[in-house]
């Protein structure tokens, strides 16, 4: 089913169980990445800095900011490593990880079965994100099905390409979300589909986007995970308790608030309750 409508409480145990099961299927042999991080005290993390509350450039300081940036820095702090942020794009982020240009990916890349077959990942998700479409307020598009046979902009490598293709839309894929959104404003497509956490704040807070609205419900909501290379079980095992504790302590909820992510994710509340109950 393309558009998820099930309650968060029912979905999270299923998703979490699936993630843990798939991680267990990866190689159990020791990996070199964790050894390298511990020896060099450097952690290379690929992040998207294309704008929005998960990753962008602060216009005042010209430094990276966002929830993904905060999470990368917190992982580095707990590992005793200096964090080197490496900007990536949807079109090249997997290659950067596979080629060893980064140790981890925290790059707006939600879990899918296809991605789980070629990469490794920390089993506990740190967020849950679905897609939405920005369309003109006077557009006749009111449902996802209305996009059939219409030109729709998105990013290359986006997890939304597959469900959009199944809806029968004409995909126009760009290197970044910024280019995709610019194409929408240039009337090159009838909608631009990206993470709801990017689209919603943009439409709510930016004057030049006041003529646009977002579609609901979210398209294909999925868990956001930290990606590793396949078979790096040591790295995953080292990071998973950290992510659980960030849920239990409320750090991730605080990071969501600090970065003004709206609407707030009910998944974070559910995961916090779970790990507090489990004593994680």
Residue ranges and their predicted role:
Residues 34, 66-67, 116-126, 212-216, ...:
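A structural signal for short loop-to-beta-strand junctions that line the ligand-binding cleft
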């Amino acid at each position: 089913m393309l558009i998820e409508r099930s309650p968060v409480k029912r979905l999270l145990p299923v998703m979490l169980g699936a993630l843990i099961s798939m991680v267990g299927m990866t190689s159990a042999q020791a990996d070199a990445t964790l050894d390298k991080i511990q020896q060099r005290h450097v952690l290379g993390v690929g992040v998207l800095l294309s704008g929005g509350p998960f990753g962008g450039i602060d216009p005042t300081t010209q430094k990276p900011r966002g929830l993904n940036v905060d999470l990368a820095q917190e992982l580095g702090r707990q590992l005793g490593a200096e964090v080197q942020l490496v900007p990536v794009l949807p079109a090249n982020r997997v290659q950067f990880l596979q080629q060893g240009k980064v140790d981890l990916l925290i790059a707006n890349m939600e879990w899918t079965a296809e991605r789980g077959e070629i990469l490794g990942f920390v089993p506990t998700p740190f967020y849950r994100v679905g897609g939405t479409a920005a369309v003109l307020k006077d557009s006749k598009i009111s449902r996802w099905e209305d996009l059939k046979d219409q030109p729709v902009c998105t990013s290359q490598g986006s997890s939304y390409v597959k469900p959009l293709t199944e809806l029968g839309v004409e995909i126009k894929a760009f290197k970044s979300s910024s280019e995709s959104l610019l194409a929408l404003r240039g009337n090159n497509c009838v909608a631009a589909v990206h993470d709801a956490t990017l689209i919603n704040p943009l439409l709510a807070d930016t004057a030049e986007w006041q003529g646009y609205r977002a579609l609901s419900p979210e398209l294909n909501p999925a868990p956001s995970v930290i990606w590793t290379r396949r078979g790096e079980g040591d790295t995953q095992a080292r990071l998973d308790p950290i992510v659980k504790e960030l849920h239990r302590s409320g750090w991730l909820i605080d990071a969501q608030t600090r970065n003004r992510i709206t609407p707030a994710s009910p998944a974070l509340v559910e995961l916090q309750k779970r790990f507090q109950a489990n004593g994680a």
